[in-house]
């Protein structure tokens, strides 16, 4: 790389040729060189990397994707360019490998990165969708509105890995958003018990008073799991009116603690 900065004429052509050598050791050294050079000269290595990513040999492909991941950290635009092509490939291995790199461009990829995640969340392959859904928690930290839309479209995915990432993301979204509040109420009715549990636990954050009790009572009619029924029963009751003595006392503010020096002072005798 340092030599290429000073004199780069034809160097990338030589590198490309060495990657096609018959000798495996030569190709190995050339792949190592590409991994060092591509993050510095992404445009000069673009065609070489594009070819290596689709190489039939597993080791070539492994090294190429490792190179793409490092390049994406330095040059988000280059990462998005290659990923945009990879997630459209018919070869599911390319789509799976590309989806795993999406997290690298999530924070800085902007609208292009969001589109790549969206397309991958709609892929027919569960592993691709799972890798794309792993981007959602990080996306929620930089663009909560977009993350909310993607969570909404992925919440009822049949894959357990996708749902796990959706649940993780739900806890980081803006709870004051009406859209998020509706998402949580919908999730509390889902067939998946883990998703229901996560959403039921969020109800007391997005709802209060009569509305909370009304929703909890409605959910209680269809909930079958003992653990979740117990939780909903507590949410559906007005503790001030229907709670036990212990529950009512628990809601009262505790008395201020009396400092020791005052507690030791004896009352004056009369």
Language model region names:
Residues 23, 29, 57, 125, ...:
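Intrinsic disorder/low-complexity segments enriched in polar/small residues
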Residues 217-270:
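Eukaryotic acidic, Ser/Thr-rich intrinsically disordered low-complexity regions
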Residues 22-23, 56-57, 90-91, 124-125, ...:
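Short inter-helical turns and helix N-cap capping residues of alpha-solenoid HEAT/ARM repeat scaffolds
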Residues 6-18, 40-52, 74-86, 108-120, ...:
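Amphipathic alpha-helical scaffolding segments comprising HEAT/armadillo-like alpha-solenoid repeats
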Residues 5-6, 20, 60, 88, ...:
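Intrinsic disorder/low-complexity signature
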Residues 1-6, 17, 28-40, 62-74, ...:
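Structural detector for internal amphipathic alpha-helices that build alpha-solenoid repeat scaffolds
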Residues 193-200, 213:
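Short amphipathic alpha-helical surface patches that serve as generic macromolecular interface elements
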């Amino acid at each position: 790389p340092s030599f290429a900065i000073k004199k780069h004429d034809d160097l990338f052509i030589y590198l490309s040729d060495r990657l096609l050598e018959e000798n495996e050791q030569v190709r190995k050294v050339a792949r190592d060189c590409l991994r060092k050079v591509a993050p510095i000269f992404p445009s000069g290595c673009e065609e070489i990397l594009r070819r290596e990513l689709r190489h039939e040999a597993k080791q070539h492909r492994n090294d190429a994707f490792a190179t793409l991941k490092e390049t994406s950290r330095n040059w988000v635009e280059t990462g998005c360019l290659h990923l945009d092509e990879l997630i459209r490939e018919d070869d599911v291995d390319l789509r799976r490998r590309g989806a795993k790199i999406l997290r690298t461009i999530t924070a800085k990829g902007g609208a292009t990165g969001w589109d790549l995640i969206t397309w991958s969340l709609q892929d027919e392959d569960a592993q691709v969708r799972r890798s794309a859904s792993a981007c959602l928690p990080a996306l929620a930290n930089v663009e909560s509105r977009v993350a909310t839309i993607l969570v909404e479209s992925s919440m009822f995915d049949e894959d357990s890995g996708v749902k796990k990432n959706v649940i993780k993301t739900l806890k980081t979204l803006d709870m004051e958003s009406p859209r998020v509040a509706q998402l949580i109420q919908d999730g509390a009715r889902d067939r998946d018990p883990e998703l229901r549990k996560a959403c039921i636990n969020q109800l007391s954050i997005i709802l209060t008073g009569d509305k909370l009790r009304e929703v909890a009572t409605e959910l209680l009619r269809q909930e079958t799991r003992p653990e979740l029924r117990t939780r909903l029963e507590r949410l559906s009751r007005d503790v001030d009116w229907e709670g036990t003595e212990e529950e009512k006392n628990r809601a009262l503010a505790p008395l201020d603690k009396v400092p020791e020096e005052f507690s030791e002072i004896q009352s004056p005798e009369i």
